[in-house]
Swiss-Prot record:
Catalytic activity: N(6)-[(R)-lipoyl]-L-lysyl-[glycine-cleavage complex H protein] + glycine + H(+) = N(6)-[(R)-S(8)-aminomethyldihydrolipoyl]-L-lysyl-[glycine-cleavage complex H protein] + CO2
Record-listed E.C. numbers: 1.4.4.2
Organism: Nitrobacter winogradskyi (strain ATCC 25391 / DSM 10237 / CIP 104748 / NCIMB 11846 / Nb-255)
Names of the cofactor(s): pyridoxal 5'-phosphate
Signal peptide: none
Purpose: The glycine cleavage system catalyzes the degradation of glycine. The P protein binds the alpha-amino group of glycine through its pyridoxal phosphate cofactor; CO(2) is released and the remaining methylamine moiety is then transferred to the lipoamide cofactor of the H protein.
Identification of the protein by name: Glycine dehydrogenase (decarboxylating)
Length: 954
């Protein structure tokens, strides 16, 4: 841990919700003499950590910001004109302050409960509309992790949808290098072959199920891709176009060119580069492919009154439903970044975006004219914002001169240089570039002779962003109010506890968020020279050391951009390990029936065959079934994927035995780290038999969920798997046996690592351990209070749960017809987000309070649940029919209380202000219960005027 001089202060006290007095009272309620006694009952003694964490004392908030300023000072955010899909951009201050820095936006969860998510669902609907308009395609999803993984998802979609039987995919030689590398990683375990070449000449002889084409190309060239797209389609394959959104304001859209799929990044729409992320990628498809689209899709439906309402559509496509049949494991997306990019488009409108694009292109054309005059005519005669020049033997000299001007260029191995201009480029930037090449010209002297580098037959003729939302909020006052109106519709952690099991919705402290927007962290290009990112590398080194101490592993990769991507990287490491030992035939992955849907989906993507292991009556892995299947598949056993504590909310007693069984049959143990919030400081996966885990930094380590992303899923491994961690073409320290990259950037979404770094630094060893203990206490307290009303389904042999618990209302459904959906929607009337519904056990609710919630908030939640149970008793007694009850009519809106006619058997007050809820601080749900079936039957995923649907519903 970093040395410090001042004594520790009390950040941990502010992070942990219950006071010492509250903890004592809660311990009495659960019947434990102390926190340590409770831990001894909740955790098996065989896994308890033998030595304490070695992280030192926690820093104060003032101290940690001073420390972060020192790290930031080690970074050098030069003007990076490297390109490759990353551009300098301006995040409008009104969006930075009111979305990126606003907990109403960044502390929200994924909008699975649409009634309390209408604000961000509308913002995502705007994002989808923006993508559809610019790409000219019919349906767009609500973001993916980055452009490279979006390309990999598109390849998988093409393979699934194509009528071609071949297993080869064509990759344009103009695709960004990191995209090609990620495509190789994705293709290899699935037995797919990549064919690279010039699509305008090489496609005729290629037998492929699809192709990805870069538009404009990585060199900057702008080509007419229509012949290539026609050639792909003539073979029965699918055409994927990786397109620059800003360029599409001036260029013919991929849809008009004939593409089936468009992918790319929305980073340059207001999202800082952040040394690699996070950024929102996109995917748009033609209408015929909409049911194969990976990730989340926002659609328009109606509520119980027929009022238009947004919701997540076609969820049966997603990994948590399809499981091992899924072709994608996408779970976390990049919602917060997609919202920022959509607001950037709302802020500028189509005219503003086109003006930015024209300015960038004018600077590019002027730069090209000057370079041509100097004898460095660009190799690409067409361009939007990027030029490639042959510098030959002068390459290093020019790079050095540019660096002295504060500019980074793209250095290519063939002696060429890439120059990618952006929104931040000004005339002085162009003049500085000329100086690097040896001239001292005035911009004005050259501009008049600059040609138009956009091909005339590729200039855009179709309108975009025609919906009123992209025209009505041009003044800051109007935009400010629009963003406030949307955030007021949502329920996030800034309003109330979000008790979602397996999601760890803990405090995202303000101090943890502050350095994120500092220029020294935000404005670094991921492929900038490493010496310009020394502050980041110091952070990486410290952070990895801390995670190793916390987990008991020997090596860490920070590259995965989500927990699901961490799973994928970990399984690839296992696959690489077996291959290196001459055991490539080991492809069976054992997965308990209770596993999160990403587990089987990730195994499928890694080329493994999923074999399901049963769970016993206690919810634990059935060890006898595990032993049977391990023996049955001993020759082919690759791994087991197991979550610990289990998804049933219990520390399984036989975890060491489970690991030993798998190891004894030649397999490796992948321990899903989704529930690591119950282990930090108490137990370490690397000590009790696990070989690899991912860590959800957006759960245990305080990166906010952002309404559905960003996330981070670094993986820890034991020493024998370390050589197989993901590499990256941009860094040269990877081992020869490293698997390929799983993310576009070498360190994933590096900028948000600052959040988790600060959390660990402020909590220190004792604070982190106390957080874990209180998380377990809070869950046991809720279990104790609710069990007389809603039975707790699973406990360990000593009657304890881990950091979450499952309550079981299924008997009540059988008796009264009340569903978990009814309970979830009724909780909204009490001002709460619902617990996790029907996972891992259908018809149940899984509750995780985290350590950050106070006893008062826990009691408020328990009181609400008990009051709901009393309402169910009214149905049991026959005083209400379920169809006429407040549970079935929930959530109640302001429209309900204002109804002239009230014919329900309960009063307005009972419906809208249920027992124990506050009238003065009431959260009013903006819509009634959303009709999911209607939304899927009448799929609308981008916006004509919303009023059209209101009229249609009447």
């Amino acid at each position: 841990m970093i040395a410090r001089e001042e004594p520790a202060t009390t950040f941990a006290r502010r992070h942990i919700g219950p006071s010492s007095r509250d903890i004592a009272a809660m311990l009495e309620t659960v019947g434990a003499k102390s926190l340590e006694a409770l831990m001894n009952e909740a955790l098996p003694p065989s896994i308890r950590q033998k030595t304490p964490l070695d992280l030192g004392e926690g820093f104060s908030e003032t101290e940690v910001l001073t420390h972060m300023q020192a790290l930031a000072a080690q970074n050098q955010p030069l003007t990076s004109l490297i390109g490759q899909g990353y551009s300098g951009t301006i995040l409008p201050a009104v969006i930075q302050r009111n979305i990126l820095e606003n907990p109403a936006w960044y502390t929200a969860y994924t909008p699975y409960q649409p009634e309390i998510s209408q604000g961000r669902l509308e913002a995502l609907f705007n994002f989808q509309t923006m993508i559809c308009d610019l790409t000219g395609l019919d349906v767009a999803n609500a973001s993916l992790l980055d452009e490279a993984t979006a390309a990999a998802e598109a390849m998988a979609l093409a393979e699934r949808a194509s009528s071609v039987k071949t297993k080869a995919f064509f990759v344009d030689h103009e695709v960004h290098p990191q995209t090609l590398a990620v495509l190789r990683t994705r293709a290899e375990p699935l037995g797919w072959t990549l064919v690279t070449g010039d699509p305008l000449h090489d496609l005729d002889k290629a037998d492929v199920f699809g192709a990805v084409l870069q538009y404009p190309g990585t060199s900057g060239v702008v080509r007419d891709l229509r012949p290539a797209i026609a050639a792909i389609k003539a073979k029965g394959g699918l055409a994927v176009v990786a397109a620059d959104l800003l360029a599409l304001t001036l260029l013919t859209s991929p849809g008009v060119l004939g593409a089936d799929i468009a992918i790319g990044s929305a980073q340059r729409f207001g999202v800082p580069m952040g040394y690699g992320g996070p950024h929102a990628a996109y995917m748009a498809v033609c209408n015929a492919l909409k049911r194969l689209l990976p990730g989340r899709l926002v659609g328009l439906s109606v509520d119980s009154r027929g009022t238009p309402a947004y919701r997540l559509a076609l969820q049966t496509r997603e990994q948590h439903i399809r499981r091992e049949k899924a072709t994608s494991n996408i779970c976390t997306a990049q919602v917060l970044l997609a919202v920022i990019s959509s607001m950037y488009a709302v802020y500028h409108g189509p005219e503003g975006l086109a003006q930015i694009a024209r300015t960038v292109h004018r600077h590019t054309a002027t730069l090209a004219a000057g370079l041509t005059r100097l004898g460095f005519a660009p190799l690409n005669s067409t361009a939007f914002d990027t030029l490639t020049v042959n510098a030959g033997e002068r390459q290093s000299e020019i790079v050095k001169r540019a660096s002295s001007q504060g500019i980074n260029l793209r250095i290519n191995a063939d002696g060429t240089l890439g120059i990618a201009l952006d929104e931040l480029t000004i005339e002085e930037t162009v003049e500085a570039l000329w100086r690097a090449f040896g001239a001292t010209w005035s911009y004005a002297d050259v501009e008049a002779h600059a040609p138009d580098l956009l091909p005339a037959d590729l200039k855009r003729k179709t309108a975009y962003l025609t919906h009123p939302v992209f025209h009505e909020h041009r003044s800051e006052t109007e935009l400010l109010r629009y963003m406030r109106k949307l955030s007021d519709r949502d329920l996030a952690l800034d309003r109330a506890m979000i008790p979602l099991g397996s999601c760890t919705m803990k405090l995202n402290a303000t101090t943890e968020m502050i350095p994120l927007t500092w220029a020294a962290f935000a404005n670094l290009h991921p492929f900038a020279p490493p010496e310009q990112a020394e502050g980041y590398f110091t952070l990486f080194e410290n952070f990895e050391e801390w995670l190793l101490d916390i987990t008991g592993y020997d090596a860490i990769s920070l590259q995965p951009n989500s927990g699901a991507q961490g799973e994928y990287a970990g399984l690839l490491a296992i696959r690489g390990y077996h291959a290196a030992r001459g055991e490539s035939h080991r492809t069976v992955c054992l997965i308990p029936s209770s596993a999160h849907g990403t587990n089987p989906a990730s195994a499928n993507m890694a080329g493994m065959d999923v074999v399901v292991v049963a769970c016993d009556a206690r919810g634990d892995v059935d060890v006898d079934d595990l032993r049977t299947k391990s023996t049955q598949h001993a020759d082919r056993l690759a791994a087991i994927m197991i979550t610990y504590p289990s998804t049933h909310g219990v520390f399984e007693e036989r975890i060491r035995e489970i690991c030993d069984i798998v190891h004894g049959h030649g397999g490796q143990v992948y321990l899903d780290g989704a529930n690591m919030n119950a282990q930090v400081g108490l137990s370490r996966p690397g000590d009790y038999g696990a070989d690899v885990s991912h860590l959800n930094l957006h759960k245990t380590f305080c990166i906010p969920h952002g309404g559905g992303g960003p996330g981070m899923g670094p993986i820890g491994v034991k020493a024998h798997l370390a050589p197989f961690l993901p590499g990256h073409p941009a860094i040269d320290d990877a081992t020869p046996s490293a698997v390929g990259p799983v993310s576009a950037a070498p360190f994933g979404s590096a900028s948000i690592l600052t959040i988790s770094y600060i959390y660990i630094l402020m909590m220190g060893s004792e604070g982190l351990k106390r957080a874990t203990e209180v998380a377990i206490l809070n869950a046991n307290y809720i279990a104790q209070r609710l069990d007389p009303h809603f039975p707790v389904l699973y406990r360990n042999v000593k009657g304890r749960v881990a950091h979450e618990c499952i309550i079981d209302p299924r008997a009540l459904k059988a008796k009264t017809g009340v569903t978990v959906d009814d309970i979830a929607k009724r909780l909204i009337d009490y001002g709460f987000h619902a617990p996790t519904m029907s996972f891992p056990v259908p018809g149940t609710l899984m509750i995780e309070p985290t350590e950050s919630e106070s006893k008062a908030e826990l009691d408020r939640f328990c009181d609400a649940m008990i009051a709901i149970r009393q309402e169910i008793a009214e149905i049991e007694a026959g005083r209400w029919k379920v169809e006429a009850s407040p549970l079935r009519h929930a959530p109640h809106t302001a429209h309900d209380i204002a109804d002239d006619a009230w014919s329900r058997p309960y009063s307005r007050a009972q419906g809208c202000f249920p027992s124990g809820s506050s009238r003065s601080d009431k959260y009013w749900c903006p819509v009634g219960r959303v009709d999911n079936a209607y939304g899927d039957r009448n799929l609308v995923c981008s916006c004509p005027p919303v009023e059209d649907y209101a009229q249609a519903a009447e």
